[in-house]
Structure formats: C-alpha cells, structure tokens
Amino acid sequence: MKVDDKISSFFALLKLSIDSQKDLYAFANNPDFALFKKLFISFDAREVKIEGAKQLHYFLIIHDIELHAEFKSAGVFTRMIDFLNEQGINIWVDDIVNNRLFEFLHNKGYKASIHKNRMGWISCMFKLAEKP
C-alpha cells in the first residue's frame, strides 16, 4: 500500500470513528487504529478539569509526534491537526520537543496551557479558542 493510500485510509477511518461514536475514548482505543498507531502517531484520550472551568474538557492526546520518515513529507501531522480542528477536538501533546509545533497549533486557533511535571517533562494541552 502506498503512503498516500495509507494516509487516505487513516483519515477515512478517523472520520468514520468520530462521526459514529463522538466518544474520544472509544475512538482512541479503536482496534482498527493499531496499524496506524505504529505507522503514524500514538494517541489516547483524556478528560481534564481546567482551572476555573465549569465542565470537563475532552482531549485527544498525541504521545509521539515523530513520524516515520516516509510519512514526514506527506504532511500527515498537518492534515491530522486540520482534521481535528474542523471536528472541534481539543489536543493534548505529550513531550513537546520544538517551538514550531506551538506556533503551528496557535495559528490554527488553539490556546496552549503548558504543564511541567516533577521530572521536568513538558506536556501541553491545546484547547480550541472559543468562537466569538
């Protein structure tokens, strides 16, 4: 299967999963994603109480932002973020490794809240900015 075919299959499954379930836990743990987790990116789901918020917010957690070489030039991560943005899904990125990712997500309309644990690891939750 060619890279473009794999990417197209991934997004078709992603859209179907989100449209049919609207449940990030079920989506992130869908066994059909096992192949793509190895090829593209590792993800999970989490609900987070944001300080001052009245409700829980749901985030898709992206654990590994390093893609295999054959997929880097195909724009997989950019396409995934665009897709999640269109679906209104918040993102939690574990282990931030470069500022370009911050800038990219900020430009897409996400507001960052940075967290550092006791070991010094940085993770960042990106909540979609409220539309006026």
Question: PLM features: residue spans?
Answer:
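A conserved beta-strand-loop-helix scaffold within acyl/acetyltransferase catalytic domains
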Residues: 28-59, 63-64
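Core SAM-dependent methyltransferase catalytic element
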Residues: 125-130
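Short amphipathic alpha-helix that is part of the acyltransferase structural core
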Residues: 1-28
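Conserved active-site alpha-helix within GNAT-family acetyltransferase domains
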Residues: 95-123
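Hydrophobic, well-ordered beta-alpha structural blocks that scaffold small-molecule cofactor pockets
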Residues: 30, 79-83, 102-104
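Conserved acetyl-CoA-binding loop-helix of GNAT-fold acetyltransferases
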Residues: 72-86
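Conserved GNAT acetyl-CoA-binding A-motif
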Residues: 85-98
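A short, internal acetyl-CoA/4′-phosphopantetheine-binding micro-motif in the GNAT/acyltransferase core
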Residues: 63-72
